[in-house]
Amino acid sequence: YYIRCQENNRMKNKIFELYKPKSLADFLSFKEENPKENFVYVLQHPPANINILGASDFGYLVICLPNFGPDSQIIFSSSPFVFKMQKNLRDVRQQDYILLTGDPAVIGISCAIVSDYTSGKFNLLKWDRREAKYYPINFDLYQKG
């Protein structure tokens, strides 16, 4: 049992970048062929000096937006951005994870979109600097009590 659990929690070695047409097609095909796999939706590709591979312990990494550089402001016109993120996050399920990276506006809008798609139940990954690892945080926004 321990070995099986350890194997199931091992790093996933595929990374999908939804902003690249071939990678998007590969993701859609892989997701259809592997419906039980979990995915970690990385909202924006992190800078080169930040390693997010530890998040792959929770599922295959799915990067929604490229890294636009440190001086870039992503949202000047909100409608096209909201449409793009609705498209990128449309396959997210309650068992998947969201890795909050990038512009705070990207994070805020994306969490709202994910909440709409999952009826307020979703998982985030939080980085713990002291332990140097990710911890899952489960949300149920409409929970009574």
Please state what every model-predicted region is.
Residues 1-2, 27:
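Aromatic (phenylalanine/tyrosine) cluster motif
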Residues 11-97, 109-145:
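Long, low-complexity, Lys/Arg-enriched
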Residues 102-109:
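Elongated alpha-helical scaffolds
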